[in-house]
Amino acid sequence: MAKNTDIEHDAHEPAGHGDVRESAVENPSASAVSDGEERATFAPEVAPQTDTESAQGAAQESEPEVQRAGEAEKGVPEKAKAVVPLDELLPQKVHLIPLTGRPIYPGIFTPLLISDEDDVRSVESAYSDSGFIGLCLVKTDTQNPTISDLYEVGSVARIVKKINLPDGGLNVFISTQKRFRIRKHVHHSKPIVAAVQYLSDLIEGDPLEIKALVRGLIGEMKELSENNPLFSEEMRLNMINIDHPGKIADFIASILNISKEEQQRTLEILDVRKRMEEVFVYIKKEKDLLEIQRKIQNDLNSRVEKNQREYFLREELRSIKEELGLTTDPKERDQRKFRALIDSFHFEGEVKEAVESELEKLSLTDPNSPEYSVGRTYLETVLSLPWHAPEKEEYDLKKAQKLLDEDHYGLENVKERIVEYLAVRKLRADTKGSIILLVGPPGVGKTSVGKSIARAIHKPFFRFSVGGISDEAEIKGHRRTYIGALPGKVLQGLKIVKTKAPVFMIDEVDKIGSGARGDPAGALLEVLDPEQNTTFRDHYLDLPFDLSHIVFVLTANSTDPIPRPLLDRAEIIRLSGYIDTEKVEIAKRHLVPKTLEKNGLKRACVSYRKEVLLHLVHSYARESGVRGLEKSLDKLHRKLATEIVLGKRSFDDKCLMDEALIGTFLGKPVFRDDMLKDANKVGTAVGLAWTGMGGDTLLVEAITIPGKASFKLTGQMGAVMKESASIALSWLRRYSAQQRIASPNWFEKRAIHLHIPEGATPKDGPSAGITMTTTLFSLLTQQKVKPRLAMTGELSLTGQVLPIGGLKEKTIAARRGGIKEIIMPKANVRDLDEIPEHVKKGMVFHLVESMEEVLSLAFPKGKRVRAGTAAQSASPETLTG
């Protein structure tokens, strides 16, 4: 393919006319080629000559130069030249050269760069044959165009001169002569040869109208060229010298900034009048574009002038200040900024003295010294804190209650306590802060409850965790003497929320550590204590700051590791685990929509029946919270999304999730009901335990081995639990001897092994005392414990059942595990009121005071004591939920 390098470099430059006009001035022959009509000047066979009176002078004037060029190229004597009409000399078959830029109009002298090997061979062949080539524009840019990729109308051009390039290409100087239309294809592929039909301009209509159109075109172009520096004076002169209307239209079209398609359309118009009218439209577009450019240029000039004026004024002002000694530097700007902030806060007492002193020291310090940077950072920190008094709280208690209900399902006791707290706060009109400690297993919503409190009272929320930290500087900051010192987390949070009365959540206070760098728990005491936090001193700030307006919300999994002084300062709200029905509702309302959106699925893509969600909870997510349930749902929806992407399912088809599909996606159930089956054996009993993760059921089992008397305990029991096991064995031996349940030497001839499964999990506490005693009694009497019965209670050495803790969590765990009856200490009867009614519904609670009562309930049909002694035992009290 051929490229016109002038066109490629500047879209506003006419197609080869920059070179044409320059050649026309310096070389008369070029002018003759451009302005001559229906004639060709070439060597060796013919000599240039016109057949019209108007063109004869130009042809004669250019004849010597063209003849010399012909002799130089062809080596033919001057006498061999002749004058032949152009139409007779133009070949009927031409080699076609594809053009990629723009079409080239007739009457143009321009260079062409030929780089394609096939095109080079085509030019060489045409040069040695007729000396003419056909130029056709490519419709779309392709690597190897064929004749079908070319427009049918093009220009035939005479090869004036060719120069071989070092890379094998050609630089060809051509003179275009006339339009043609491809009539027949001789060679479809390169080199492309076609039979052509030559086209002449059609001039129809009133000559005066044609003349008026010519004058109009020239006038429009004159106006356009005067305002456009891209149009040279030489172009304007050449345009005026052209006397043919069609060539004037061609010339103007070639120099306008229009698309190659528009230029091709102009090339194909043979009616000169229509061609000139088409060019008028293009000139109008160019003038509109030029007007927009002029407007943009004027705007830019105005901006530049304004910027230059401001620059000169600033320089002048700087010079004046230098003369008067009033130069403003960064240090002065810092002084003004800090002074304005200090005045706006109206500091008093120690704080005012400290910031004034620091500002004065800063004014005497070199800005390039490290001390200046330290002082400036300190002042920026002090002045970025919210020192102003907090605004009065305004919130609607009903809306707050509604907000809590929207954010959390269940947790009725927790929400009730929070609403009570907000009601008291509203009645007292007190903006003072408070300390709330949310205690519960992971995943029950402690953090989200804290966020809901902040939303309910319209306060900003800030959260940070103290789990694992062992440096008190995290709470109280570093002293300024250290490089890179920073304030503690509390003041950093206040800088972020920009108010003195936010809601601060301090997570994982039960996991706070201590080490060589101080005790963070002790540092928290000063932060939380209402008697001290009105004048809290951060190590970095070293100024009193009032923290008493902050609402502190602490979270923990257990209160056991928390220091007692810290517990005394907080109002404890316990969040127990969820039962299965609550988890199902939480999944339907929150978790299913959340995980569907997370995995790019629509709500209508999946449908869950209640019993399917219940199966998912029961088999894969029995923990106290709902994080495991969320992970299971997330995995289900990931698997479903994968099948949709792989084409195994349609995105629009609704998936009805069932137990089989859950098993396919999640694998075998994580939890099984084997515990109740295992408990229905001699030497087993089910107890209830409470941990930081919530309540849980505990299977206790025992066996005897003939041999020397011994008592072995396994299952990672703690010291307290081992003591409970020893008490259980001692009481049972005494009770068996009194009631003559077994022979006196039964214990002497057997080794007893008591075990609690899940040996990898540490276990401790006294509440398994009655469970271990019941297990040993079952082993002694070879009786099975009543099915679906669980128990909890501490046993004393005299057989009394003592109260325990965590009854609510244990009851929830029992319901989750399918337990129907619970034996519990009578002293814990008050704790039943804290258990929600929907948890107690359908369950039976046996309140006992002695171990004899426990045995009478655990073995209702078996022999417990020797005849005549049962009446000595009190009857247990039974409550139904």
Swiss-Prot record:
It is an enzyme of class 3 (hydrolase). It is found in: Cytoplasm. Pfam families: AAA, Lon_C, Lon_lid, LON_substr_bdg. It catalyses: Hydrolysis of proteins in presence of ATP. CDD domains: RecA-like_Lon (cd19500). GO terms for biological process: cellular response to heat; protein quality control for misfolded or incompletely synthesized proteins. The active site is at residues 767, 810. Residues 679-861 form the Lon proteolytic domain. Belongs to the peptidase S16 family. This is Lon protease. It comes from Treponema pallidum (strain Nichols).
